[in-house]
Every structure is written in C-alpha cells, then in structure tokens.
Amino acid sequence: MHAQNVDIAPGSTSTVSIIVGIDPGLESTGYGVIEAGGGSLRCLTYGVIVTQSNQPSAARLRHIFDTLQQVISIYQPQYCAVETIYFAKNVTSALCVAQARGVVLLAMAQQHISVAEYAPNAIKKAITGIAQAEKRQVQHLVKILLNLKDIPHPDHAADALAVAVTHVHCCMSSNYAVGSTRSRGAYVTLYKKGKR
C-alpha cells in the first residue's frame, strides 16, 4: 500500500461504522478509509495504488485488487463508496477507469461489502453544498471535516476521502449526525451485497 498519512487503528465500539472510499483508475486508484460514529468523523488511512504503465493490463488490475484486499483485511469496512465514471472524450481513458472500477466492485463483492456509487457533482454538493464547486474547495472541506493537518495528497486520495464522507452525509447522517443532510437527494446507486 502507498499510504500518505499515519495509519490509525479503527475503533472497537459497535456504534462505529467504517467506510472505504475509492477513486478508481488504472494508473492510480485512490483509497481513503474513515470511521463514522458518535457524531464525528475520523480518517484512518488514505493513499494511492500506483501501477506501472509498462506492465500488462491484467497485472496492473491484479495489483489493484490485491492491494484493496489488504486494505479490507486491515480495516474491515462495512461500506464502500465509489466515484462514478464521468463521460470523457478520451474513450481509452474511460475504458481504463471502467476496468479498475470492475476490480474494485469485485474486491468488495467478495467480502460482501455494500457499495454505493456517487456522481462527481453529487460528491461536490455533499461536501460543499455546491454541485459545481472547485476541487480545491472540496479538498479544503475534507481536511476540516476529518480534522487533518494538511489537505490530503495526491488528488486521487483526496477524492477517495471525499466520496467516503459523501456516503456518510447521504446515507448515514440520520444515524451519526455528522455534517449536513443537504445531499440526501443526490444521485446515488446502491449495491447491497451484490444485489442492485
């Protein structure tokens, strides 16, 4: 794993939920694990899974899968939140992201982890209240919400933390009273134990 901050052991109380956020990509897949409970959020770890462009696609996807399995094994998340693929002009790039997304969904399905997918604008709205917010605004608020010393880097890791926080705001705020509930109506596709 390529963690970008100090890892923290997850809490042990039954009222705590652990969410892993994922920003999928073949070259770099961002991940961020947060803990929600008692009206607060806590960052457990974040980082990026980097693959080598000179390796076959199958080997790169296997590396993403294996690293995600390690993250799951260590932090035992109950929920996963994934940023959806946006329509890009570059078809090749979109296909690469789709491949990485498939590996993410498989890794979660194998461990019976519920998965939710959020559109980029829904993530921005959940964090800032503005669907067209700038990336820097989102990152700054993620830093504040998770009580981090600095804005998370690289961007893929920050995006992964943002989608994890979005899941709390959209689907868990009534239980954990964390942040605003303004985004409950945002677009989200839920997958419960492999069933859509």
UniProtKB/Swiss-Prot annotation:
Binds 2 Mg(2+) ion per subunit. GO terms for cellular component: cytoplasm; Holliday junction resolvase complex. Mg(2+) 2 binds at residue 83. Belongs to the RuvC family. This is Crossover junction endodeoxyribonuclease RuvC. GO terms for molecular function: crossover junction DNA endonuclease activity; DNA binding; magnesium ion binding. CDD domains: RuvC. The gene is ruvC. Mg(2+) 1 binds at residues 23, 156. It catalyses: Endonucleolytic cleavage at a junction such as a reciprocal single-stranded crossover between two homologous DNA duplexes (Holliday junction).
